[in-house]
Every structure is written in structure tokens, then in C-alpha cells.
């Protein structure tokens, strides 16, 4: 469920140099919305750095989705009757780091709270799903085993996307999944343990691009408010 989209975002007009608890994602690649924003209807997809963290935001433009970046690693997403979006904060490149995170995640319908990243050579989109809404993405993927880590069992899956949007345009690529059996919205994720488990299951990664603690939604509504750190 990935789509990088032109996001439909409603932003209230702001005047003056007011300090804001959140920065709205604007159209500049650096993502630092420190200047006054004017009212706008459409914000383009973007990635860059904000308060020392890498961020990525993509939407297919359907429905309403609003992404706001707070202090440090904090971000917030609100969405209603959306198409497909995925966004969050983390690092570039991805590594086997241990990721600490917490916050709230309240999907009404289909949505994921996950560690999300990409590699090249091979081109792979990967997910470590910590919580999800009404749809378990493993239900239509190939089960490749399990791994016990960070206090629970994760089921491993692989699926293939044919001629779909990716970090390198429209491509065919594999998706790797680790799906936690008991959902949670805070904790630690040892990514090296997942990478090792995938490799043992024949699911090989390439050279890492970004790695974020992401919120993703598809044809749903909801909200999330998340912070992320590394140990």
C-alpha cells in the first residue's frame, strides 16, 4: 500500500512571525516551514530534514490529509476519507539501529503504524508493522516465517508490486513485511533482528535509502501523533 501523492492539505492562513508548536509541511525541499504560510489547497510530496531528522511525505492526492512536523522528532497526521498516504520522521540512510517510539495512532479503517524504508539494488520497500487498523497486510502476502524480538512474535511476509510508484518512479519491486502479533503504539524495534530474519528467509535487502517511523493510511480516516528516537 504505497503511493506517493500530491497531498490535498487545508492550511489556515497565518500572519506574523508567530511561534508554532508544529511546522506545516510546505513546498520547500528542506521541510522547514519557518516562514509564514499562506492559505493553500495543494501541497506537493516532499522529503528532507527537519530539526535533525529526515522526513518523507507522500500522498496520491485523494481525500484530506494534513501532516505537521513538531519539535525534534515529533510529527502529527490527521486524515479524512483519504486515498493513500505515507509519511513520518527518521533517518537517511536506514541501518540496523534500535528505534524507540511512542505516541497515539487512531485509524478508522485501513492504516499502519510502522518502521518504513527502502533499499536499492535490489529495489525493496519494507515494513515493520507495530499496529494496524482494519486490514492486516499479511492476508494477501506469502508467509515466510516468524521472528521473536522486542517482546513479541512477528510474522514475516513477502509480496510483489507490479509497475507501481516507488522511490525510482514506476517499477516492479518486492515488499518485505514483519507484522507484530500484538499491536502496540510505543516501544523499541531492533531493526537488525528483522534484517537478519528476512535474510534467513531469503528476503535480501540492498543499499539503504531512508528509514522512518511512519503513519500510512488507505481509504480511511484517523489521526496519529508520534515521536521517534534511536538508542
Curated annotation (Swiss-Prot):
Signal sequence, renumbered to the chain: 1-19
Active site, UniProt feature: 125 (nucleophile), 216 (proton donor)
This protein's record includes keyword Acyltransferase: no
Annotated pathway: Glycan degradation; xylan degradation
GO MF term (any one): endo-1,4-beta-xylanase activity
UniProt main location, coarse: secreted
Keywords: Carbohydrate metabolism, Glycoprotein, Glycosidase, Hydrolase, Polysaccharide degradation, Secreted, Signal, Virulence, Xylan degradation
Pfam families, alphabetized: Glyco_hydro_11
Enzyme Commission numbers on file: 3.2.1.8
PROSITE patterns: GH11_1, GH11_2, GH11_3
Regulation: Inhibited by the proteinaceous endoxylanase inhibitor I from T.aestivum (TAXI-I).
Enzyme class at the top of the EC tree: hydrolase
Domain GH11: 41-229
One GO BP annotation of this record: xylan catabolic process
pH dependence comment: Optimum pH is 8.0.
Record flagged with keyword Glycoprotein: yes
Temperature-related activity annotation: Optimum temperature is 40 degrees Celsius.
Sugar attachment sites: 32
Subcellular location(s) of the protein: Secreted
GO cellular component: extracellular region
Highest taxon of the lineage: Eukaryota
Induction summary: Expression is highly induced by xylan.
Catalyzed reactions per annotation: Endohydrolysis of (1->4)-beta-D-xylosidic linkages in xylans
Protein role: Endo-1,4-beta-xylanase involved in the hydrolysis of xylan, a major structural heterogeneous polysaccharide found in plant biomass representing the second most abundant polysaccharide in the biosphere, after cellulose. Plays an important role in causing fusarium head blight (FHB) on cereal crops.
Family membership: Belongs to the glycosyl hydrolase 11 (cellulase G) family.
Name assigned to this protein: Endo-1,4-beta-xylanase A
Gene: XYLA
Amino acid at each position: 500500500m504505497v503511493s506517493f501523492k500530491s497531498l490535498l492539505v487545508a492550511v489556515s492562513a497565518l500572519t506574523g512571525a508567530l511561534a508554532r508548536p508544529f511546522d506545516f509541511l510546505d513546498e520547500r525541499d528542506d521541510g522547514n516551514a519557518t516562514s509564514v504560510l499562506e492559505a493553500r489547497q495543494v501541497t506537493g510530496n516532499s522529503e528532507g530534514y527537519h530539526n535533525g531528522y529526515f522526513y518523507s511525505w507522500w500522498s496520491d492526492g485523494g481525500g484530506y490529509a494534513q501532516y505537521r512536523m513538531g519539535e525534534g522528532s515529533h510529527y502529527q497526521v490527521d486524515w479524512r476519507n483519504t486515498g493513500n498516504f505515507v509519511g513520518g520522521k527518521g533517518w537517511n540512510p536506514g541501518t540496523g539501529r534500535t528505534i524507540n517510539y511512542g505516541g497515539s495512532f487512531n485509524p478508522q479503517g485501513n492504516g499502519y503504524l510502522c518502521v518504513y524504508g527502502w533499499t536499492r539494488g535490489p529495489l525493496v520497500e519494507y515494513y515493520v508493522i507495530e499496529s494496524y487498523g482494519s486490514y492486516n497486510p499479511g492476508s494477501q502476502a506469502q508467509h515466510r516465517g516468524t521472528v521473536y524480538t522486542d517482546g513479541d512474535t512477528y510474522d514475516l511476509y513477502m509480496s510483489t508490486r507490479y509497475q507501481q510508484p516507488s522511490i525510482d518512479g514506476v517499477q516492479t519491486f518486492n515488499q518485505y513485511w514483519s507484522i507484530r502479533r500484538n499491536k502496540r503504539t510505543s516501544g523499541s524495534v531492533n531493526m537488525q533482528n528483522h534484517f537478519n530474519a528476512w535474510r534467513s528467509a531469503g528476503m535480501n535487502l540492498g543499499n539503504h535509502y531512508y528509514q522512518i517511523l511512519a503513519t500510512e493510511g488507505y481509504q480511511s480516516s484517523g489521526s496519529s501523533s508520534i515521536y521517534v528516537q534511536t538508542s
